[in-house]
Regions:
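Long, well-ordered, tryptophan-enriched scaffold segments
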Residues: 3-88
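Conserved short loop/turn motifs at secondary-structure junctions
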Residues: 69-73, 96-103, 181-183
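Extended redox/cofactor-interaction regions of prokaryotic respiratory oxidoreductases
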Residues: 23-27, 111-217, 225-233, 302-391
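Long, contiguous, secondary-structure-rich segments that constitute the structural scaffold
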Residues: 252, 258-302, 371-382, 386-468
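Short beta-alpha connecting loops at secondary-structure transitions
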Residues: 9-17, 225-228, 240-252
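Glycine-rich phosphate/diphosphate-binding loops that line cofactor/substrate pockets in enzymes
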Residues: 57, 79-92, 162-174
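Flexible, glycine/charged-enriched surface loops at secondary-structure junctions
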Residues: 39-44, 92, 124-130, 273-280
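Phosphate/diphosphate-binding loops
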Residues: 193, 199-203, 207-210, 244-267, ...
Length: 468
């Protein structure tokens, strides 16, 4: 990780790297695995495309010593980690999402996926790599998304909503409907997002349960139901588990679920397709029926009864690689470069790397409505004591972090949980709790990842000074 989290404190051994350098560490681990004879050559020959090329053209440049200069880990620590991983009975990597939130995030993903391939982890019970395995893959999403009803429309990346609302476009965005989101708080480049939301010619509707930061900019706020007030079908985020949920209370007041609002809008717009006459339960029934396409039979009776259902998996599912070659493609001629390699993240021209980490009390900006949070540690900034001493800063000082996009105020907390040169603030707090209504996303960028159009929330540098 990039700093000592609560999870790291529970570990037998923890390794902390500079933000955005996971790819350099992965290559050094592969270098050691190959040198120490800990690779599974039979698995590599049968199931991996490009190992020999990677070993010949890339790995020699990425020694533990070179990676130490990049990651901040010692060469000895890198070797220790490589040997432990290579000798494990069931080498397993659990990936979060933080490593991908840099401009080199996609490349880092390619490099991390090379590790279980190198040691043949996929063939071992309990071995492999897990990022996200949403149970929603069991459903046909076309049932709800209905691509056949859509005309060709412009798609706007949510990570670039600030630019989309403020730049001259043809046609310009004149209306904004916000649901299940709070972009005034959670979107990057908060200053630009706010500038867009303040436009006099932008008509904004927010469908919400609480008066969020975004709702404060709305022309109309529509009350939304909670999960207790509407039926739905749920898919686990990290398990192959799905479950039908029924409403347990009637909608409060005029609250309506997303689907009901969509149907009412369709009716008001004169859209008469039968799709918009279906109920939530109709759609849920169709989604459950679509699980017929899952590789093995799904217990529909249990689903209908509202029980959690684990999706059955084929015996060899871990070796069924969904690529053109049917192998793990370390070498992919369609990619540039064809072989994975490390390159630094973008960052900014400022001295400190800034990480906006999760806080266990909230999820993104959800649960900010809890009154006790306004009395807790909000907008606290973790800094290594040695860095603070050099700048003449003390624990508890009011400080300001700045870069070309904006500024945000914090209370300084000195801690050896963070690395030298790194600052960490936990939690995406409603701007109501932030000085000057400036949250930490004043500092984050609309830059996108190298593939996939993902966010780069952690690829940020700032300067810091005592607040006057």
């Amino acid at each position: 990780d990039t700093y000592e989290t609560a999870t790291a404190r529970q570990a037998d051994r923890a390794f902390f790297v500079r933000p955005g350098t996971d790819g350099a560490l992965a290559l050094a681990l592969l270098h050691v695995l190959e040198k120490e004879g800990l690779t599974d050559e039979a698995f590599l020959a049968a199931h991996v495309q490009g190992w020999q090329e990677l070993k010949k053209d890339v790995l020699p440049r990425h020694t533990p010593e070179s990676a130490a200069a990049v990651t901040g880990l010692s060469p000895e620590a890198i070797r220790e980690l490589a040997l432990a991983y290579g000798k494990a009975r069931a080498p397993f990597i659990r990936l979060g999402s933080g490593f991908s939130r840099y401009t080199n995030g996609a490349m880092t993903t390619r490099l991390l996926l090379a590790l279980p391939a190198a040691v043949g982890a996929w063939k071992k019970p309990g071995g492999g790599l897990l990022s996200s395995v949403p149970g929603s893959r069991a459903f046909s999403k076309d049932i709800v998304q209905r691509p056949d009803l859509r005309k060709n429309v412009r798609l706007v990346n949510m990570c670039e909503i600030g630019n989309a609302l403020t730049s001259a476009s043809d046609p310009p965005i004149k209306s904004l409907f916000v649901y299940s989101s709070n972009p005034a708080c959670t979107a990057p480049d908060q200053k630009k997002v706010t500038e867009g939301l303040l436009r006099d010619d932008l008509f904004t509707v927010v469908h919400e349960r609480f008066l969020t930061d975004t709702a404060l900019y709305a022309d109309i706020v529509l009350p939304a139901t909670t999960s207790l007030e509407h039926s739905d079908i749920y898919a686990a985020y990290g398990h192959y588990t799905i479950q039908r949920g029924e409403a347990v209370i009637l909608p409060v007041g005029e609250s309506k679920p997303n689907w009901a609002v969509a149907c009412l809008l369709a009716d008001a717009l004169g859209l008469d397709d039968p799709f918009f006459k279906k109920s939530e339960d109709d759609l849920i029934d169709e989604l459950i029926a679509s699980t017929d396409a899952w590789p093995l039979p799904v217990d529909k009776a249990a689903l209908a009864a509202g029980l959690p259902v684990d999706l059955p998996l084929p015996e060899n599912y871990k070796l069924d690689f969904k690529t053109p070659s049917g192998k793990i493609e370390l070498l992919n001629p369609k990619e540039e470069p064809p072989l994975p390699d490390y390159f630094p993240a973008h960052g900014d021209d400022e001295p400190f790397q800034f990480i906006s980490a999760p806080d266990a009390r909230i999820l993104d900006s959800s649960f900010n409505e809890r009154e006790e949070l306004s009395r807790g540690k909000v907008m606290e900034l973790l800094m290594h004591p040695d860095d603070a001493e050099k700048l003449g800063l003390a624990d508890g000082d009011p400080v300001v972090c700045s870069n070309e996009r904006g500024t945000a105020s914090f209370t300084l907390a000195l801690s050896r949980r963070v690395l030298l040169g790194t600052l960490v603030s936990e939690g995406v707090w409603w701007r109501t709790y932030c000085k000057g209504r400036c949250g930490l996303n004043m500092l984050t960028s609309q830059r996108l990842t190298d593939k996939g159009g993902g966010s780069t929330f952690y690829d940020v540098n700032v300067r810091i000074e005592r607040e006057s």
